[in-house]
Amino acid sequence: MSKRILILDDNQDILEIVHETLAYEKFDVKSTSNGEDVMPLVAEFNPNLVILDYRVAGINGGDLCKQIKCHPQYKDIPVIIFSAYINHDDELMGYGCDAIINKPFDLTELVDKVNGLIS
């Protein structure tokens, strides 16, 4: 059975590229551009990994990461945060994420991080 990945990014181009790249790598991928959709999708889709953009309209990826990591049922799901903010890694790690990928990023780096976290 394919590993499931949930992606949040409000940049449609990035969302599509990441979705297509991970689907090509044989992952079962769901994506959304709305932060309010994340927790219901986590409950419904039961992902093996979540990728969150740090800055999205409404609830940000850091706060969503905290919600996932504080929930008894979801706390062990690895979370990657995308960020365009260089030199904020300590702040981002404070949300409990398992990895940070700075934008712009290399798709090979993304796939390697994903594989490392869910293998």
Please place each PLM-identified region on the residue numbering:
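Acidic catalytic/metal-coordinating carboxylates
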Residues: 33-34, 60-66
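Acidic, metal-coordinating helix/loop segments flanking the phosphotransfer/catalytic sites
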Residues: 31-49
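Active-site residues of response regulator receiver
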Residues: 53
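Two-component/phosphorelay signaling modules centered on CheY-like receiver
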Residues: 12-30
